[in-house]
């Protein structure tokens, strides 16, 4: 029973990989593999890409949205695309990496100016046994830095 399950899983994984990596059936039947490649002008490693990559790298919605956002000063990606006369995968990857790095920095810097730990790290185990109105530890469970 387990060998048939493993066989089924193996066949389904192989079928999934073959469906995602092969070109469409009509290109294979025609035998014309040059139509299955998209050519860019330039001699880089991105000069010839399979059509599947271009389908996943569809920039038409971004360009349509960028037409009315091009006047805004907060559109550095659209400015870079205008200067380069079209998008290049290398520039888009560098822009997305930079944006992801800034997102991580914002998360790290959020609690630093406040001086308090987040709610998940508060010290709830230091509740005094005798509650006194004059003591400062009576009602707060917030641990303060320094």
From Swiss-Prot:
Major localization listed first in the record, in broad terms: secreted
Keywords: Cleavage on pair of basic residues, Neuropeptide, Secreted, Signal
GO cellular component: extracellular region
Top-level taxon of the source organism: Eukaryota
Keyword set includes Heme: no
Tissue spec. comment: Neuron L5.
Propeptide: 25-80, 92-146
Record's keyword annotation contains Ubl conjugation: no
One GO-annotated biological process of the protein: neuropeptide signaling pathway
First and last residue of the signal peptide: 1-24
Cell compartment(s), UniProt: Secreted
Function summary: May have important functions in renal physiology and in animal behavior, as does bradykinin.
Record-given protein name: Bradykinin-like neuropeptide
């Amino acid at each position: 029973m387990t060998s048939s399950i493993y066989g089924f899983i193996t066949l389904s994984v192989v079928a999934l990989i073959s469906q995602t990596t092969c070109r469409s059936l009509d290109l294979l039947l025609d035998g014309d593999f040059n139509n299955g490649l998209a050519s860019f002008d330039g001699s880089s490693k991105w000069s010839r890409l399979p059509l599947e990559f271009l389908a996943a790298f569809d920039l038409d919605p971004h360009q349509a949205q960028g037409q009315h956002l091009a006047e805004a000063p907060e559109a550095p990606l659209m400015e870079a695309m205008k200067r380069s006369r079209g998008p290049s995968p290398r520039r888009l990857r560098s822009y997305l990496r930079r944006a992801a790095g800034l997102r991580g920095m914002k998360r790290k810097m959020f609690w630093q100016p406040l001086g308090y730990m987040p709610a998940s790290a508060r010290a709830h185990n230091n509740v005094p046994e005798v509650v006194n109105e004059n003591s400062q530890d009576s009602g707060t469970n917030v641990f303060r830095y320094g």
